[in-house]
């Protein structure tokens, strides 16, 4: 067995753009023969995947699944909505979700490692960067999920509620984007930041500080209601709040998770001509 030196790994990295561990693995399998390693990497799609790794993957799908008293939600990204609808991409996302559920995996790095070879092969086949972005789970007495197309997914956990109510609550979360369950759950740093913003606005209107502070106190109560699930008007019956709805059913929400495809990812905008030019350079 030939010695796989750091300089050999470095050279392969420079020539292929692949990751260090991928290069070391390829060299080991090729017994230190760098040309054979490159040939094998080309066949496996590793080089193509490495070249695509820098491309922003901000499209994709959200998948949800309930397994007993635990529900899982997963986001897998690609670069375009066209690929997001591809059967192979969808099957890959389903397989990753099934593995997360079966193994109770909530560490995305574990999933990434488990499916790296399949991801690389799919990148080579489809021609876009693919990323297993995030996974989460939620436990509860009664669980519900809702998916708005493939782009928004919601899990809701409740007690004292039936499945229909939990489904409606999940639909509400999808539409209204609450950040917390109850107004009292709003974190101190969020409250303080909003308080300062509102105080500055009130002071700029020329109000004395004492009056401005009283105005802001009223606004803050409204703010914590707006960002919390129970404080929001129920989307299916806006005359009542979600909190009032839950009280009528003697139910309580213990948690929720909302994923939306690409949220927080800065997508690079390119015009059609630039996109065609970029594609011609790659071919």
Curated annotation (Swiss-Prot):
Which Pfam families does the record match to this protein?
A: EF_TS
Q: Which CDD domains match?
A: UBA_EF-Ts (cd14275)
Looking at the UniProt record for this protein, which Gene Ontology cellular component terms does it annotate, in alphabetical order?
cytoplasm
Q: Which UniProt keywords apply?
A: Cytoplasm, Elongation factor, Protein biosynthesis
Region annotation (Involved in Mg(2+) ion dislocation from EF-Tu) ranges: 80-83
Q: Where in the cell is it found?
A: Cytoplasm
Superkingdom of the source?
Bacteria
What InterPro entries does this protein's entry cite? EF-Ts_dimer_sf, Transl_elong_EFTs/EF1B, Transl_elong_EFTs/EF1B_dimer, Transl_elong_Ts_CS, UBA-like_sf
Q: What PROSITE patterns has UniProt attached to this entry?
A: EF_TS_1, EF_TS_2
Tell me one GO molecular function of this protein. Answer: translation elongation factor activity
Q: Which family does it belong to?
A: Belongs to the EF-Ts family.
For this protein, the record's PANTHER family field holds: ELONGATION FACTOR TS, ELONGATION FACTOR TS, MITOCHONDRIAL
What is the purpose of this protein?
Associates with the EF-Tu.GDP complex and induces the exchange of GDP to GTP. It remains bound to the aminoacyl-tRNA.EF-Tu.GTP complex up to the GTP hydrolysis stage on the ribosome.
Its name, as the record gives it, is Elongation factor Ts
Q: Per the UniProt entry, what species is this protein from, by scientific name?
A: Salmonella paratyphi A (strain AKU_12601)
- The protein's gene is named tsf
